[in-house]
Amino acid sequence: MSYLVPMVVEQTNRGERSYDIYSRLLKDRIIFLGSGIDDTVANLVIAQLLFLEAEDPDKDISLYINSPGGSITAGMAIYDTLQYIRPDVSTICVGLAASMGAFLLAAGKKGKRYALPNAEIMIHQPAGGTQGQATDIEIHARRIMNMKESLNKILAERTGQPLERIQKDTDRDYFMTAQEAKEYGIIDEVISHPKKTSKK
């Protein structure tokens, strides 16, 4: 199913210029992650982050998230890039940040992680399904357990929660309101109006 991407027209000293809405947002250092996370989506987000860093390494970037989650490896590629680049990245949950979406929400610069009042956040353990020979299934099971351990450690570090609590809470789907996510440490503030972006 394809969606029509709105175009916006801007007046410049050279006349009119039209942009698709995402390109126009990018001009204001805003990246919108509004879908499930797979390799294609991750590559687009990473490319935008690297482009904005090259444009101005000292100016904040805003990453808006409305995502049900997705691939762990794709999400971790975004996470590593968020930590790698020099600009502070502010994360803002609009709608839903679930699974890897919640993980990326927590990955923003501490003090600059937000959610709108009616946003919903959900954390849980990695899921995976594999078929084949028993030894291959065992290899994949070990890999998923290693990923689970790694994700839990990072989430504990990002939220300030004890690792034991993260392990318990992610054992099943754990839903939170925006306020509960603030108390948990996934975000720093529930906001109703835009925050002013700043230099570092």
Curated annotation (Swiss-Prot):
Q: Which UniProt keywords apply?
A: Cytoplasm, Hydrolase, Protease, Serine protease
User: What InterPro entries does the entry give?
Assistant: ClpP (IPR001907), ClpP/crotonase-like_dom_sf (IPR029045), ClpP/TepA (IPR023562), ClpP_His_AS (IPR033135), ClpP_Ser_AS (IPR018215)
Coarsely, its chief localization is cytoplasm
Q: A Gene Ontology MF term for this entry?
A: ATP-dependent peptidase activity
**Residues annotated as catalytic:** 99, 124
GO-annotated biological processes: protein quality control for misfolded or incompletely synthesized proteins
Query: What catalytic reaction does the record list?
Result: Hydrolysis of proteins to small peptides in the presence of ATP and magnesium. alpha-casein is the usual test substrate. In the absence of ATP, only oligopeptides shorter than five residues are hydrolyzed (such as succinyl-Leu-Tyr-|-NHMec, and Leu-Tyr-Leu-|-Tyr-Trp, in which cleavage of the -Tyr-|-Leu- and -Tyr-|-Trp bonds also occurs)
Q: What is its EC number?
A: 3.4.21.92
Q: Where in the cell is it found?
A: Cytoplasm
This entry carries the following GO cellular component terms, namely: cytoplasm; endopeptidase Clp complex
The entry sums up its family as follows:
Belongs to the peptidase S14 family.
Q: What NCBIfam families does UniProt report for this protein, alphabetically?
A: clpP, PRK00277.1, PRK12553.1
Kindly give the HAMAP family that the UniProt entry links to this protein: ClpP
Subunit details: Fourteen ClpP subunits assemble into 2 heptameric rings which stack back to back to give a disk-like structure with a central cavity, resembling the structure of eukaryotic proteasomes.
Protein purpose: Cleaves peptides in various proteins in a process that requires ATP hydrolysis. Has a chymotrypsin-like activity. Plays a major role in the degradation of misfolded proteins.
Task: Provide the protein name.
Answer: ATP-dependent Clp protease proteolytic subunit
* Native species: Syntrophomonas wolfei subsp. wolfei (strain DSM 2245B / Goettingen)
Question: Which gene codes for it?
Answer: clpP
